[in-house]
């Protein structure tokens, strides 16, 4: 138990000697420096240096008399003080590193992401940084894993629009159900995800290969613009189909199958990106 407490105090930036002295005072106080050394096992040659460090840091109080006596800050107060100090440090770091944000958001690079979980984690981070609009193409199987972040963004006033492959229901997003979800899944033999945030960054890739899934994240305008516009073009098409499906299917077949086949390069009319 004592060893565990020593480790905990070390995690709170106590040295080993400081930890032993503080624990000794928690068990019994007030004590003289000599008594603290005897009770804690800290060498007498080091004890006053250790106690002075604790006093300066505010973890121990000292009464200045003929024989100084030491008492510890109560454990609850110590934890509260450490938590407040840590929050101050985080606030300072956040303000300091803000000026490097633009450098970190390098608009010239394209970054590869490997693994389905890693791809979805990046998408979550992008979602939470969006300020105005999110455009997303996603399968039902993957939607649930980022739904909480999407809802949080929507509650912050971000407009969320989803092209859904599969039956996705949402009370916070504009959802366009793709009528050909099953056909497309079979045709491609896989699932992709395309995210665009604020017309300034995109994540796009295949998410159906588990650890072998691949995606790219970028703020490069040469990719952000066309990928975002492809999503918007799909939305245009879905709005047109909603109003003129009968007319269009009369010309191009059910679910526009003739168009899909017209622009296929394979005799089986399937996609072979994953081969």
Curated annotation (Swiss-Prot):
Protein origin, superkingdom: Bacteria
Organism: Bacillus subtilis (strain 168)
Gene: yrhO
PANTHER family: HTH-TYPE TRANSCRIPTIONAL REGULATOR TRMBL2 (PTHR34293:SF1)
Keyword list, A-Z: Coiled coil
UniProt-recorded name of the protein: Uncharacterized protein YrhO
Recorded coiled-coil stretches: 75-157
Gene3D superfamilies: Endonuclease Chain A, Winged helix-like DNA-binding domain superfamily/Winged helix DNA-binding domain
Pfam families: Regulator_TrmB (PF11495), TrmB (PF01978)
């Amino acid at each position: 138990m004592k060893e565990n407490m020593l480790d905990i105090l070390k995690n709170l930036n106590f040295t080993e000697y400081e930890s032993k002295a503080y624990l000794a005072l928690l068990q019994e106080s007030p004590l003289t420096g000599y008594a603290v050394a005897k009770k804690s096992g800290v060498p007498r040659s080091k004890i006053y240096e250790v106690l002075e460090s604790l006093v300066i840091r505010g973890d121990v109080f000292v009464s200045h008399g003929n024989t100084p006596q030491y008492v510890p800050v109560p454990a609850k107060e110590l934890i509260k003080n450490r938590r407040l100090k840590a929050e101050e440090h985080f606030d300072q770091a956040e303000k300091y590193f803000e000026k490097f944000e633009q450098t970190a958001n390098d608009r010239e690079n394209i970054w590869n992401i490997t693994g389905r979980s890693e791809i979805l984690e990046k998408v979550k981070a992008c979602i939470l940084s969006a300020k105005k609009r999110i455009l997303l193409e996603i399968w039902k199987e993957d939607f649930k894993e980022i739904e909480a972040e999407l809802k949080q963004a929507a509650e912050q006033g971000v407009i969320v629009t989803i092209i859904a492959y599969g039956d996705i229901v949402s009370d916070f997003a504009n959802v366009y159900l793709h009528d050909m979800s099953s056909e497309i899944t079979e045709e491609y033999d896989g699932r992709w995800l395309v995210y665009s945030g604020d017309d300034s960054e995109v994540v796009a890739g295949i998410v159906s290969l588990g650890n072998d899934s691949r995606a790219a994240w970028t703020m490069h305008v040469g990719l952000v613009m066309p990928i975002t516009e492809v999503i918007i073009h799909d939305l245009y098409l879905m709005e047109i189909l909603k109003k003129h499906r009968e007319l269009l299917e009369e010309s191009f077949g059910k679910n526009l199958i003739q168009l899909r086949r017209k622009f296929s390069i394979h005799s089986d009319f399937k996609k072979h990106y994953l081969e």
